[in-house]
Amino acid sequence: MNGPIVIVGIGELGGVFAKAFLQKGYPVYPVTRSMNISDQADSIPQPELVLVAVAEKDFKAVMATIPAAWRNCTGLLQNELLPRDWKAYDITKPTIISVWFEKKKGQEYKVLIPSRVHGPSAGLIAESLENIEVPCKILSSEDELLYELVLKNVFVLTINIAGLVLEEGITTETLWTQHNELARTIAEEVIEIQEWLTGAAFQRKRLIDGLAEGVYGDPQHRCKGRSAQGRLTRVLGIADEAGLEIPRIRDIRAHLML
């Protein structure tokens, strides 16, 4: 019999993963806001996987509550995720999913490109998602994982920040074809921030090419999500801490304040 899987936060994405795991025969136990997570850890002391599926804005608060017994089998799927984010909670070998599909309320999930997975439970996750027709690519090294996390951050932050100053409902294809200079400039500044956060240097052309791949994975994907303003605020806070100029992104903030 397959071991139990715990999902902390059953939102739209969490629901997709729950479906995937259940269809592969894994018992799934949700942990919601109203539940005491320590009590759940006492009831399920040795889960196969603890997938933290909460939104980015709730990540720190939830991670601080993850019981010690669960930290060696933790899975993370948030955007804006980097190694320092899990190392801050003494998690050394998590399973990480760079999610490249979206799920909105009342709609089926939509795949952009294959999601990237790395870590002890990568095979379990990839097999489960592929069973519901969500393709995955298993990464073989931490260097690959770091690149893929940075790429996803560049994609999400670029389209969200650009979407704040362009017409409502603009798609990624329109951004890339009609506002390419804006998209590339924002992406370059986001890469600066990612390099400061990681202490690593990246091939910028490769990241820009990866951004374009994401754009054409779903050309009708809308740029500005509900979290766009919060992402801009976080980016500016990091840039201030790092002493980075990022003039185009700062101009966007100034424009929004007019």
Mark where each language-model region is.
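NAD(P)-dependent Rossmann-like dehydrogenase/reductase catalytic/cofactor-binding core
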Residues: 2, 184, 188-258
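Rossmann-like NAD(P)(H) cofactor-binding subdomain of soluble oxidoreductases
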Residues: 2, 8-10, 14-22, 29, ...
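Helix-loop-beta segment of a Rossmann-like dinucleotide-binding subdomain
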Residues: 12, 101-113, 167-175, 213-223
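Anion (oxyanion) recognition and catalysis
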Residues: 22, 130, 240
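Short phosphate-binding/catalytic loops that engage adenosine nucleotides
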Residues: 26-27, 134
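Rossmann-fold dinucleotide-binding core
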Residues: 74-152
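Active-site-proximal catalytic alpha-helix in oxidoreductases
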Residues: 144-191
